[in-house]
Amino acid sequence: MAVISMKQLLEAGVHFGHQTRRWNPKMAEYIFTDRNGIYIIDLQKTAKKLEEAYSFVRELSAQGGTILFVGTKKQAQDAIKEEAERCGMFYVNQRWLGGTLTNFKTIRKRVERLIEIEKMEQEGALSVLPKKEVAKILKEKEKLSRFLSGIKEMKKLPDALFVVDPRKEKIAVAEARKLDIPVVAIVDTNCDPDEVDYVIPGNDDAIRAVKLITSKIADAVIEGRQGEQYAE
């Protein structure tokens, strides 16, 4: 059974690349043609590359591996959060904090602070503090929560990254590469595919296209997890 159909890819507009003047020549092999100054991505290749990425994610997940979903551009934020939560994985959809991977211990301390504040709230510890102090703590919580809630349960480095637009998320990709963490990504015609281990050529600007491909990666995680359960 194919992971995705041509019809699904076409309907979501996965084939629309960027304007021809904004392109990376390394993406030439994934381009079918250009139409009215816009590159059209070869969906046969997208389907094939998505199959490869799907297999990788499924196998990783079956072995108990974890994936960090990354997409901070407006078109990706909702899909990244929804799909990561659906498959029980971690996500960053606001701003990538430099050092999230390469300085993981420090980031983890900030996460622990967030958990501590949440615990104080639950136990009613804030009610005994002066109002000014409470306001300050809640403001801190709001900021921490915004950037870190998606990685709150991530107690160690992830085994792979799934990225929407590696050009926009270049810091995340660079950190992953430095640590030899494989990167799966939706790569549009203006991106550098050499930075990515599992390239999925496609439109990274249309909400429907991003949602479709992100949901397939989440499906792969779920399928792998089911295999893991059966293997036990």
Curated annotation (Swiss-Prot):
Provide the alphabetized UniProt keywords: Ribonucleoprotein, Ribosomal protein
In the record, biological process GO terms are:
translation
InterPro entries per record: Ribosomal_uS2, Ribosomal_uS2_bac/mit/plastid, Ribosomal_uS2_CS, Ribosomal_uS2_flav_dom_sf
Its transmembrane ranges are none
Coiled coil ranges (UniProt) are: none
State the Gene Ontology terms under molecular function. Answer: structural constituent of ribosome
Keyword Ribosomal protein (UniProt): yes
Q: Which SUPFAM superfamilies match?
A: Ribosomal protein S2 (SSF52313)
Q: Which CDD domains match?
A: RPS2
Q: Does the keyword Phosphoprotein apply?
A: no
One GO cellular component from the entry? cytosolic small ribosomal subunit
The record's listing under NCBIfam families reads: rpsB_bact (TIGR01011)
Give the UniProt family note. Answer: Belongs to the universal ribosomal protein uS2 family.
Q: What is this protein called?
A: Small ribosomal subunit protein uS2
User: What is the protein's species of origin?
Assistant: Carboxydothermus hydrogenoformans (strain ATCC BAA-161 / DSM 6008 / Z-2901)
